Amino acid sequence: MRKVGIMGGTFNPIHFVHLLLAEAAYEQYHLEEIIFLPSKRPAYKPLSELIEEEHRFHMIELAISDNPHFSVSDMEFHREGNTYTADTLLELTKKFPDTEFYFIIGGDSLFELEKWSRPEIVMEKAHIVAAGRDDKDDDQMLQKIMELNEKYKAKIELLRVPMMEVSSRMLRERVKEGQSIRYFLPEAVRSYIIKHGFYL
């Protein structure tokens, strides 16, 4: 049975915390690879802030080019309408029945998981790996993990990783305000954003 990590999100833009989470999950769960899956149209985010999917895809390619166990897939771009994790996991588990999928989420998403579309399918079809931002979050997160595991017979675990306080929203705001985003994300991604005038 292969073990593959899935890193979903808009990646608008991708930054070092995304990469740090993926690498930590790869190591801690002995995964064969991590697949980055950018969303086409997430149901919960305003489309006005979202740059075109081909640019977000290319920025991921730039960011992961030096990591042999990272790859990126555009499978969610080919679906009409909003993008839902449940649909993606149903498609993946049907296509790859001999693979165990580990879906990597931030700690904030753990507390929103039951509000997702068909959360029971998400928790049935994949191990959920939830990243804690720091030790003080552990008790709350572990309590929530126990609650969801019991309620949904889920396989949720805590991913312990040193975290920086960086978000895609923060980077978009810094660009808009003319502030530097150097050292928050790979240099190739920063150059691509500047070249195309994104987030101004």
Curated annotation (Swiss-Prot):
Keywords: ATP-binding, NAD, Nucleotide-binding, Nucleotidyltransferase, Pyridine nucleotide biosynthesis, Transferase. HAMAP family: NaMN_adenylyltr (MF_00244). This is Probable nicotinate-nucleotide adenylyltransferase. Belongs to the NadD family. Pfam families: CTP_transf_like. PANTHER family: NICOTINATE-NUCLEOTIDE ADENYLYLTRANSFERASE-RELATED (PTHR39321), PHOSPHOPANTETHEINE ADENYLYLTRANSFERASE (PTHR39321:SF3). The lineage of its organism: Bacteria, Bacillati, Bacillota, Clostridia, Lachnospirales. GO terms for biological process: NAD biosynthetic process. Catalyzes the reversible adenylation of nicotinate mononucleotide (NaMN) to nicotinic acid adenine dinucleotide (NaAD). Its EC number is 2.7.7.18. It comes from the Bacteria. GO terms for molecular function: ATP binding; nicotinate-nucleotide adenylyltransferase activity. Pathway: Cofactor biosynthesis; NAD(+) biosynthesis; deamido-NAD(+) from nicotinate D-ribonucleotide: step 1/1. It catalyses: nicotinate beta-D-ribonucleotide + ATP + H(+) = deamido-NAD(+) + diphosphate.
